[in-house]
Amino acid sequence: MDDPRYGMCPLKGASGCPGAERSLLVQSYFEKGPLTFRDVAIEFSLEEWQCLDSAQQGLYRKVMLENYRNLVFLAGIALTKPDLITCLEQGKEPWNIKRHEMVAKPPVICSHFPQDLWAEQDIKDSFQEAILKKYGKYGHDNLQLQKGCKSVDECKVHKEHDNKLNQCLITTQSNIFQCDPSAKVFHTFSNSNRHKIRHTRKKPFKCKKCEKSFCMLLHLTQHKRFHITENSYQCKDCGKAFNWFSTLTTHRRIHTGEKPYKCEECGKAFNRSSHLTTHKIIHTGEKPYRCEECGKAFNRSSHLTTHKRIHTGVKPYKCTECGKAFNRSSHLTTHRIIHTGEKPYKCEECGKAFNQSSTLTTHKITHAGEKPYKCEECGKAFYRFSYLTKHKTSHTGEKFYKCEECGKGFNWSSALTKHKRIHTGEKPYKCEECGKAFNESSNLTTHKMIHTGEKPYKCDECGKAFNRSSQLTAHKMIHTGEKPYKCEECGKAFNRSSTLTKHKITHTGEKSYKWEECGKDFNQSLSLIKQNNSYWRETLQM
């Protein structure tokens, strides 16, 4: 029912109608008298409040706080904060004591709820209306309607004959409504009807604008406000608009840097209460979201959702360029850079650029020489956590990924993928400069340095530079005298794994290199080269 003083419903106006509608409301506001909080407020008795479920109570709190903020926004001045709002802000139950007493002794005048909030059917089904509806069956002799009203259902009811009316109201109030499936008892038509709808799971109330359905008219009415007040609240700093004043308030904290929600455990602050709630789980170690498939638990529902895709194989994020699909949006974003060739993350130390921030972070460690990830088994340290994880399998001997072609096992799927290229001969990484192709991207990156002459890995001790970090690591052992690669057969140690491999051949007698010219075998490629040179010298002298 539209408020006749303002020419439109108070709730719509208070929500901040777009453009001309808001201007018209402001004009009406000053011409026809101020709109008070009582005009847009709803109060409950304890009995009525307890009949609402938790979702309805939460919706009520949100709507009342929003109505008050809208009213302050409309008035443009500070208003005296109503007790109801103070109660809601403090998280207390907002039922009204005076109203509770009125319901205990049935009211002479029925409460008038704003139609735009509770809607037509909800108004008719309110607690007092239900009583009056029952009483209406016995005749309206004892009731006098307000001027201009057509029926009891439309208007406020005035007392004319106290005793008869009160007696009738007390009698009708004794009627209760019971739901057969759950034997739950209700004191109002509305709560009984709403409860029954939940058993049928029907959603009879449909939004004409977006076709979304609801089981309660109240929820539909609340939903409609999103369409009516679309982008009504605009941020003065960046121009971004929002449907809710509360959303704008939260957004403003990005500009102000305000973080009102502080963790009592560690002092870390957040700009949203939900972020604080999520953060607290770190301290408790709680992981309430568990995968039914494998039992793995997570502290965020979003993490569980992403994890489930491993089992289902769903990859909803597809690259429009090549058709490749991913189970995470972040993976798709990273993948797209392959097509663009963009490398936005640049190292300030050596100028090298990367397509991922995480790769740059890892790269920076090579300059610092820092190796924060240490193996508890042997003490070896790594500058990447993934390298440590991979290294640990050398102690366990675990190899999850097996090549179907040759039976060789690997502890990483990526290592198996690279290995398979040996059998297929695939070399997907091609140098644009000379056309040479490689089966690993890292080999192409190293190869490109031949053309550029770049040697980003420099020894702090002697200044010698290298184009591979592994070469620098091996070189540093010359200065430190470290020889980590030890022969189990004779105990001799070496500073390179390749040197140890060559040394082991002296014990096995293996000769891997054969010269096709004379059929002679050698245990080192260098010996083969020397023999080749000797052969040609002898040939030339003949």
Curated annotation (Swiss-Prot):
One of its GO terms (cellular component) is nucleus. The keyword Zinc applies. Belongs to the krueppel C2H2-type zinc-finger protein family. The keyword Transcription applies. Signal peptide: none annotated. This is Zinc finger protein 100. PROSITE patterns: KRAB, ZINC_FINGER_C2H2_1, ZINC_FINGER_C2H2_2.
